[in-house]
Amino acid sequence: MNTILAQQIANEGGVEAWMIAQQHKSLLRFLTCGSVDDGKSTLIGRLLHDTLQIYEDQLSSLHNDSKRHGTQGEKLDLALLVDGLQAEREQGITIDVAYRYFSTEKRKFIIADTPGHEQYTRNMATGASTCDLAILLIDARKGVLDQTRRHSFISTLLGIKHLVVAINKMDLVDYCEETFARIREDYLTFAEQLPGDLDIRFVPLSALEGDNVAAQSANMRWYSGPTLLEVLETVDIQRAVDRQPMRFPVQYVNRPNLDFRGYAGTLASGSVKVGERIKVLPSGVESSVARIVTFDGDKEEACAGEAITLVLNDDIDISRGDLLLAANETLAPARHAAIDVVWMAEQPLAPGQSYDVKLAGKKTRARIEAIRYQIDINNLTQRDVESLPLNGIGLVEMTFDEPLALDIYQQNPVTGGLIFIDRLSNVTVGAGMVRELDERGATPPVEYSAFELELNALVRRHFPHWDARDLLGDKHGAA
């Protein structure tokens, strides 16, 4: 057991009291991002080291690994605490998204260490999708780079409102205040074009030496602001999902016996109470909540983020992918939408292509109708393109095979975010965030003959490359 943990347990009066105190601490999810070799993994290693979150056996192993794979000479290579893949250690880079957990007396943290190489931008977007704050590292010798801009834009696109710009490697520029001021001004000029009302803070630091990470630096007395750890401990995170209407995507129909039928999932936003009237989409059927079942027993009320099972007072047809919301809420299913897309495949995204899309627990097919524009990462301007390349970001018009219950992503990331899946390889090729909804898709149902339905099913099964639309999608969506 490490020293700080033992001291905390002693201060709380025992393990049980300490565990209860941990449950009541606020949780901050954040990621580190930026360009290649800006020191993202080293920064996380320094945070873990300086908050005494490393056990003795880990420290001993780190000494040995630093001799074999380290890039810091005789010093500890703290990046090895995070870079766990063999390829990462051999190349000295981050490839996968690495998650680490630690806590201080004030807060609990989940860190996502994301890769800086452009070819791994897809992994960075994955890590950012669940975070509340982004630490953007900038090498003090290089200043603001393309990847800095790209990661900043992706972070804000994914709804992150708090950005901490950590200007790293200040030790390599002799802790120069003018260098810090110049990079700060350059980034603020760029950030004027970023969407949304952002909270941007700047911290000069050296992850390798520990300056301004967990303790104030004696080498930068000209900086009077908080350390990075102080920023993380005190930043006020207001989660929009707590204030949004209730949304409950059904992930699983739980029926362990004939006497129980519940609908399991994670409450995406808002809250739900026993006795509350709810509506099921796309069917529109209403019922009321009889029980809210959790691992710890029944509850009278559940809030956003809780994993629950809802039991209703009526036996109605609900399946995976359906959406439950308050009965007095109006959410018209849409077949057409404008989607912000981060493309992750070698093959470009082009109009006319069809993909499987997955939204919460719902999976359907969608067709790319048009690409309105691609974002130029250097200046955030819009330019006309015929296709969206690997790591490209743009606004795309899409049509779904069936009407979907969607929210705007900035209002609700769970019911407004989706992924693109290649229908032949089943590989995730893109991420999408709903920007605009077009409800013109609420068309009257069409009746098809049995022969038409059989032929349609046959074509879709044996000739998927024809991109035939599922005729039942329309019928079920309008039912």
Curated annotation (Swiss-Prot):
Metabolic or biological pathway, per its Swiss-Prot or TrEMBL entry: Sulfur metabolism; hydrogen sulfide biosynthesis; sulfite from sulfate: step 1/3
Chain residue ranges for the region called G5: 206-208
InterPro entries membership: CysN_GTP-bd (IPR041757), CysN_II (IPR044138), CysN_NoDQ_III (IPR044139), G_TR_CS (IPR031157), GTP-eEF1A_C (IPR054696), P-loop_NTPase (IPR027417), Small_GTP-bd (IPR005225), SO4_adenylTrfase_lsu (IPR011779)
UniProt GO MF annotations: ATP binding; GTP binding; GTPase activity; sulfate adenylyltransferase (ATP) activity
Domain of life from the UniProt record: Bacteria
Region (G2): 92-96
Span list, region G3: 113-116
Amino acids binding GTP: 34-41, 113-117, 168-171
Entry's family note: Belongs to the TRAFAC class translation factor GTPase superfamily. Classic translation factor GTPase family. CysN/NodQ subfamily.
Function according to Swiss-Prot or TrEMBL: With CysD forms the ATP sulfurylase (ATPS) that catalyzes the adenylation of sulfate producing adenosine 5'-phosphosulfate (APS) and diphosphate, the first enzymatic step in sulfur assimilation pathway. APS synthesis involves the formation of a high-energy phosphoric-sulfuric acid anhydride bond driven by GTP hydrolysis by CysN coupled to ATP hydrolysis by CysD.
Subunit and partners: Heterodimer composed of CysD, the smaller subunit, and CysN.
Protein name: Sulfate adenylyltransferase subunit 1
Gene: cysN
